């Protein structure tokens, strides 16, 4: 059987490629797969043991994953939720799933909720009360469970032996690392070697259980867990249009961190700003949002949204982290197999410029006007200049921009032999082009292809400008 997000959005394409007719949508009614089974699969507890089957450690590996609602009351053109979860569900029980998880896998520190529009629920107050009662009220803390005991219990129950054999080896390595007595380390290593339990691919359940009496005291000796703050994260964000003082005061009863408020387009600015002020007034000062771009927005509107967040941080004493997120049509046959979509107000050069800036900010923009203005410009004019700027000049701003070095001299104290002012040189030539030549230059720059043969231009002034775009990262780093 094939199902899930891709199969629901691209059902015809999946069937054509595989010959399998996919299941579209949620498994949220009894008998979806087995007519004689009354279980609602979508509401069953998750199997967290699969996280132990691989070497990669997920950043949110110590969180409960859940939905308390499904669907969304909106029908935004850019969003896949109406197709994935077409019917809004006001409430899904959380408490029973957490109790099952705690018993089988041990308690998790955080609660990561994937609801698409929780504020639309008629059961909103009940949902927040349940989250609080499950141990996530304001000020709630978490004491890590005994991972060794969980591992042994699950092996004895024959629950996912593959996962818990790997977990056992991981725990053994931790114990060796934490033991301070070299003789104890050596003795443990030799015992593990003798039992073939140094590596998961040679270890067996039988040998791990046989070592229990010896290993357990060492685990207890080396593991002294301390309490840690718990957090709740409505990871998909909440709808700014539905925020009120009442529902923010209610949300402030749990350890929400961060509060993610959608800011999908500039037309929402008044509603969005009001929602931020209400949240901060309710005591919620750690906020975040995704900023959709490359849809129907103009580039300058992305700057306005980013700037508004930075200004609100300064005024309200809040922390708002913004994550620009490029729109891509996932169910358009022309684009779902590539990343080539360009919005009607955008071009390939602008997209690359945003990505280059975000690489330097690690994909997010937080508080701090000086850092923001260095990355995105002091005003929308500087922002547009950065979008047209050669990519290497964006990435190595300190090397190529003398004006920036002078303006931020308190931070840029190191002088290198490579420092120059090619940015000003490029900009003067760029601005000096006649309107007709500038349009021609922009039409070439917009395609973001500058190798020999990528474009045809015989105008010397335009070619002088385009020469700066041929300077590569390798050129900079090799010099």
Model regions: which residues?
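Structural alpha-beta junctions
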Residues: 16-25, 132-144, 280-286, 310-320
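Glycine-rich beta-alpha loop elements in corrinoid/cobalamin-binding modules
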Residues: 1-63
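Short, solvent-exposed loop/turn segments at secondary-structure junctions
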Residues: 5-9, 27-31, 71-74, 82-86, ...
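C-terminal non-catalytic accessory extensions
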Residues: 416-479
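Conserved SAM/AdoMet-binding glycine-rich loop
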Residues: 101-288, 293
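Short, aromatic/basic amphipathic alpha-helical patches
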Residues: 11-19, 126-132, 308, 335-344
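A structural motif corresponding to the C-terminal lobe/cap of the Radical SAM core domain
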Residues: 237, 249-417
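Canonical Radical SAM [4Fe-4S] cluster-binding loop centered on the CxxxCxxC motif
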Residues: 59-100, 105-107, 119
